[in-house]
């Protein structure tokens, strides 16, 4: 039965206090055994009772309060209210209210015209007492402008559902789940609240949290936490889909909880980390798109750490155990230190695998736990760990690391993996750890003695059969007596240490000297001491040459070659032809040779200065009439004063060099800089590529071919053939059946609509695009505009992966059609049936936000 509040005297005129009239309708419905209390369109002013727990309106068992829609029916607190009010609408304190709910209305706390502490919607029995409310439903409700919590279901409530609702511009949290059991939060939006968007807290368990959105909140987008009391952990929480972005602190914080899954969400633009877990057990972070976080300060995109509550209510320290981070696509911002960082604070048994990580400043993964494991995707890079001007303690990970100490007396430890350790200036202690490690020295000043002092480095665990010492930057010719450009090998009296020494001093009175723990006399030779660059030579054709961790010479010869230097201090020579040169990390020397060459820089770490050292690359033969410098992956906007995303063009006739400099440091203190041999004061955007080039087709069938640069190819309408060529390209075929070839580089194949690539089984139409050269672990398929959540069975927003009978073509299929019977589908040449994972895609989950437009 329906009870219209206007039949009980409510005015809804925005002036009259309608509290008693609405409550009378609620009481009548309850007395009759239940019913619907209906509030037509209008603004209903309400006020509280004598006690905070009296609320303004007390909802009762079997009663449902229903309005005419968000923004149409508004229940608003009266002006001048200055008392605490625990719920504008709430269940009665201590009554075990059941089977009730609210829908299709707005609750307005009138924060600008009141002074009391006010909550919007409140449920529950009595905090700390046995008993509960149960079977509570909230649908299409907006709560705004309350001074405390908007939706505040409290201790204890069983079987709560809140869906398609909105909380915004409230003083604290938008949505709270405080000791909820068996709750569902679905398709809700929380924005511009003073603290958290969503807060699952106080022993809540068995929570399903689906397709919710939190943005612009003062603290975290979503928090799952025990809270400030010594209670049982929150447990069994399933977070599926949704997005958490542009919040002041973390996108998602999972703290003092257990058995939590975060899957299929997009998390970006937050002030601190994208995801932080603290003091947890059995947490799974799976198949999310986490990108461009750490907007306020340097942070990893995903942080796994323990939690110290010894000064808190439990007086305990909670070590994080058994966290799984798999299948995520992680892209860093300018402040993102690592993709995934496990802190060295007792955290252990973290399992990391099959993630796609790019764009971070210090490395992909940092692990510290003794029993933690990492398995990378093909194409994953090494970890770069950079020290400071002070005395650093730098520890690597289980994967391959490049660790550079800088100045100071540093201690470097590679851990597992095939690592490169470069102590830099100062007296350093170097431990390679497991794996075949390289100890690099680039100047006599890295390790030396003088007539009055010793600043020699010490290698603590050199393995003559696996490790190597890179001396290519010093000019020594080999072993000998320490004279004539040679190094002498000698041991101390008890054989516990071996010394590599030169007895010829440099202009500053320094003699190169290096100490190795152990006796290596007679065991050092060209297999473990590298004095000269190894040469990797190309052919007369078009070669693709890639260096490794050592200092090498890459010589392309004739042909249009692609040279990538790797980790060492390399020499790249393009030779004749139109070549692409990318030195990678290290102090590289680049020579394009004849032809129109491209010098590519993809990371600030490729060429930089910091407060302690210079790692700038040098281009030896730049030709401004033909050559170009590709900076499109770095985010610089153009030439300027070297600040605010610009590069300063600076020339020195004295040194006959030109410099491109940025003076703003990244999160690790690095300032991008490259040097060119010669004075080029007229360099402009003709030679400097700051943005990705766009090649655009027509309504007809086009054939677009990229170059060596990073380009965006847009086919438009028609049956197009797109070939990205070299470079990291974006290919978008548009409508009709297109053929897409990325070429070399890390390419993105983008689809913006179902009709870009589809099959219609009803009328037999096939407009399926074909990707000819997809590379797992390097290329990506961008479906972010289509709303798919991941790979699956082809239903409920997933794509099925299917293989044709002869194993030559792989299909991605949506088994559900649009209104016209069109099924989205893509074809990939080759067998990828057992290779593809969510990490090969850019997914954005559907954000079902109810009627938030009415609530704005």
From Swiss-Prot:
Its cofactor is Ca(2+). It is found in: Secreted. It comes from Azotobacter vinelandii. The keyword Calcium applies. Composed of one catalytically active A module and three R modules. Keywords: Alginate biosynthesis, Calcium, Isomerase, Lyase, Repeat, Secreted. Coiled coil: none annotated. Changing residue 152 to G: Loss of both epimerase and lyase functions. Hemolysin-type calcium-binding repeats lie at residues 387-402, 404-421, 422-439, 538-549, 554-563, 565-581, 582-599, 715-731, 733-749. Belongs to the D-mannuronate C5-epimerase family. The keyword Transcription regulation does not apply. GO terms for molecular function: calcium ion binding; isomerase activity; poly(beta-D-mannuronate) lyase activity. Each enzyme of this family of C5 epimerases introduces its own characteristic sequence distribution of G-blocks in their substrates, explaining the extensive sequence variability of alginates. These alginates of varying composition have different physical properties and are necessary at different stages of the bacterium life cycle. Gene3D superfamilies: Serralysin-like metalloprotease, C-terminal, Single-stranded right-handed beta-helix, Pectin lyase-like. PbH1 repeats lie at residues 133-155, 157-179, 180-202, 204-226, 234-256, 257-279, 280-304, 320-342. This is Alginate lyase 7. Inhibited by zinc. Its main location: secreted. It catalyses: Eliminative cleavage of alginate to give oligosaccharides with 4-deoxy-alpha-L-erythro-hex-4-enuronosyl groups at their non-reducing ends and beta-D-mannuronate at their reducing end; [(1->4)-beta-D-mannuronosyl](n) = [alginate](n). Converts beta-D-mannuronic acid (M) to alpha-L-guluronic acid (G). Has both epimerase and lyase activities. Contributes to abortive encystment by degrading the coat from inside the cyst. Important for cyst germination. The lineage of its organism: Bacteria, Pseudomonadati, Pseudomonadota, Gammaproteobacteria, Pseudomonadales. It holds the Pfam family Pect-lyase_RHGA_epim.
């Amino acid at each position: 039965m329906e009870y219209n509040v206007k039949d009980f005297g409510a005015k809804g005129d925005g002036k009259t206090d309608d509290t008693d009239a609405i409550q009378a309708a609620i009481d009548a419905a309850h007395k009759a055994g239940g019913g619907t209390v209906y509030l037509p369109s209008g603004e209903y002013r309400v006020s509280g009772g004598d006690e905070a727990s009296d609320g303004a309106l007390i909802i009762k068992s079997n009663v449902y309060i229903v309005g005419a829609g968000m923004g149409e029916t508004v229940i608003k607190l009266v002006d001048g209210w200055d008392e605490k009010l625990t719920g504008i609408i709430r269940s009665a304190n201590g009554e075990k209210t059941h089977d009730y709910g609210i829908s299709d209305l707005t609750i307005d706390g009138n924060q600008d015209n009141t002074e009391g502490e006010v909550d919007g919607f409140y449920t529950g029995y009595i905090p700390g007492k046995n008993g509960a409310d149960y079977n509570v439903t909230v649908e299409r409700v907006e709560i705004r402008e309350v001074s405390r919590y908007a939706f505040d279901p409290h201790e204890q409530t069983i079987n709560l559902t809140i869906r398609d609702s909105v909380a915004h511009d409230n003083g604290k949290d938008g949505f709270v789940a405080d000791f909820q059991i068996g709750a569902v939060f679905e398709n809700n939006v929380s924005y511009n609240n003073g603290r958290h968007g969503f807060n699952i807290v106080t022993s809540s368990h068995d929570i399903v949290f689906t397709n919710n959105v939190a943005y612009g909140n003062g603290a975290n987008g979503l928090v799952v936490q025990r809270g400030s009391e010594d209670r049982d952990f929150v447990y069994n929480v399933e977070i599926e889909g949704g997005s958490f972005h542009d919040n002041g602190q973390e996108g998602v914080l999972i703290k003092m909880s257990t058995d939590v899954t975060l899957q299929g969400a997009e998390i970006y633009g937050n002030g601190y980390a994208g995801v932080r877990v603290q003091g947890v057990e059995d947490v799974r972070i799976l198949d999310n798109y986490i990108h461009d976080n750490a907007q306020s300060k340097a942070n990893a995109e995903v942080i796994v750490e323990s939690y110290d509550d010894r000064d808190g209510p439990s007086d305990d320290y909670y070590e994080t155990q058994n966290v799984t981070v798999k299948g995520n696509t992680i892209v860093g911002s300018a402040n993102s230190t690592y993709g995934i960082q496990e802190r060295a604070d007792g955290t252990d048994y973290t399992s990391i695998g099959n993630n796609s990580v790019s764009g971070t400043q210090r490395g992909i993964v940092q692990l510290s736990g003794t029993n933690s494991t990492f398995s990378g995707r093909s194409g994953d890079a090494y970890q770069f760990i950079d020290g400071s001007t002070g005395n650093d303690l730098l520890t690597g990970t289980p994967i391959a690391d490049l660790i550079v100490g800088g100045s100071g007396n540093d201690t470097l430890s590679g851990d597992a993996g095939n690592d490169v350790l470069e102590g830099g200036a100062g007296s350093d202690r170097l431990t390679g750890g497991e794996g075949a490690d390289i100890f690099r020295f680039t100047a006599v000043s890295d390790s030396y003695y003088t007539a009055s002092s010793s600043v020699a480095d010490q290698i603590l665990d050199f393995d003559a059969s696996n490790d190597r010492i890179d001396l290519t930057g010093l000019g020594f010719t080999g072993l000998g007596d320490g004279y004539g450009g040679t190094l002498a090998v000698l041991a101390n009296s008890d054989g516990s240490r071996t010394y590599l020494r030169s007895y010829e001093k440099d202009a500053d009175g320094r003699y190169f000297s290096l100490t190795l723990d152990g006796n290596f006399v007679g065991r050092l030779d060209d297999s473990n001491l590298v004095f000269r660059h190894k040469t990797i030579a190309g052919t007369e054709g078009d070669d693709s040459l890639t260096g490794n961790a050592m200092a090498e010479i890459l010589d392309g010869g004739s042909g249009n070659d692609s040279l990538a230097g790797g980790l060492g201090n390399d020499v790249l020579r393009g030779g004749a032809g139109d070549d692409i040169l990318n030195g990678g990390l290290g102090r590289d020397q680049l020579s394009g040779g004849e032809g129109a060459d491209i010098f590519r820089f993809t990371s600030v770490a490729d060429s930089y200065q910091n407060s302690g050292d210079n790692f700038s690359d040098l281009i030896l033969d730049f030709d401004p009439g033909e050559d170009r410098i590709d900076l499109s992956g770095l985010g610089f906007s153009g030439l300027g004063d070297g600040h605010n995303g610009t590069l300063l063009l600076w020339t020195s006739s004295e040194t006959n060099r030109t410099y491109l400099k940025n003076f703003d440091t990244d999160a690790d203190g690095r300032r991008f800089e490259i040097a060119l041999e010669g004075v080029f004061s007229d360099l402009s955007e003709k030679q400097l590529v700051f943005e990705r080039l766009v090649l655009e087709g027509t309504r007809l069938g086009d054939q677009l071919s990229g170059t060596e640069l990073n380009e965006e190819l847009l086919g438009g309408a028609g049956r197009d053939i797109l070939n990205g060529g070299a470079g990291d390209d974006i290919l978008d075929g548009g409508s009709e059946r297109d053929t897409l070839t990325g070429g070399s580089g890390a390419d993105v194949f983008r689809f913006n609509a179902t009709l870009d690539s589809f099959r219609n089984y009803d009328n037999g139409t096939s407009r399926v695009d074909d990707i000819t050269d997809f590379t797992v672990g390097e290329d990506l398929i961008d479906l972010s505009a289509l709303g798919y959540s991941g790979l699956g069975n082809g239903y409920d927003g997933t794509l099925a992966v299917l293989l044709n009978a002869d194993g030559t073509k792989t299909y991605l299929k949506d088994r559900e059609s649009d209104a016209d019977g069109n099924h989205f589908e893509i074809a990939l040449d080759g067998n990828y049936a057992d290779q593809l994972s969510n990490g090969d895609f850019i997914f954005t989950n559907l954000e079902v936000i109810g009627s938030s437009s009415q609530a704005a």
